[in-house]
Amino acid sequence: MMGLPANTRIWIAAGVTDLRRGFTGLSAQVQTKLEQNPFSGHVFVFRGRRGDLIKVLWFDGDGLCLFAKRLERGRFVWPQATSGTVSLTRAQLSMLLEGIDWRRPERTWEPQLSV
């Protein structure tokens, strides 16, 4: 995971994004559709149409960073809204990147005592 400064906000871009876009295209989308500054130091997360690929745009103070992750199975959980942004915590971002439902995390395995 990236070492984010303490005051960094994490924004999910609701809806579907054309992930053929790179630094320039995603920065323009942050400015026009999300009405944010891509050089603010905040993290912006985008999801493609199929839902198995996300891109993360972040300005680290020296330059823009663009990270991508594709799930081999399943889809990333995404907000139902078709436009705007949703704010995440760092823990929720970690869950999102692992393919976990960050809206309602549940324990899927509980250890059993040996008898």
Feature locations, PLM:
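Polybasic/polar functional segments that serve as interface/processing modules
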Residues: 1-115
